[in-house]
Amino acid sequence: APHGDFRRAVEQERALGQLDDVVAYYEAYLQGDEPGGPASSRLKQEFDHVRDTLGDLPGRILDQKRLRTMLAHLGKTLHVGFLNDCFFDPASALCLRSDDRPAAPVISRCSPDRCPNSCLTSRHVAPWRASIEDGERLLQGNTLSAVQKVAIAQDNDRKRRLIAHLEDPKV
């Protein structure tokens, strides 16, 4: 069963990577780089609980093993993406249809601005900005109908709202 051993090793590495990403989320949160998107309030509650439980204060040496143990449940559901990350919960995932097997998010049907599992960080801003700029370039041309221009303008407004908090935390 050499293939089974390899698959297990790959799965273990994936799980460790997911946990590393969640720890990075937590550390960024402690530095004031708060996540955005619909899942952010749930994450902030989790992170506040971890901080309060561990007494994670500036200048204090943190027990990394205990931190990773407390965040492990988030790592199991994390799916890292280009435009957003998903802390996948099949019960609330907007990307799933009734006939889907809820093993993972369906990225092509993701609604980052509406799904309660969606979370964005500062690393997601650049692709959203690029998409907004592409839309603005299209709006400058004269090849689109009035309806298409309205749709692109509305979509750009939606994208701006989605990343506003990440670009200016006071928003």
Name the predicted role of every residue range.
Residues 1-171:
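Acidic, low-complexity interaction regions
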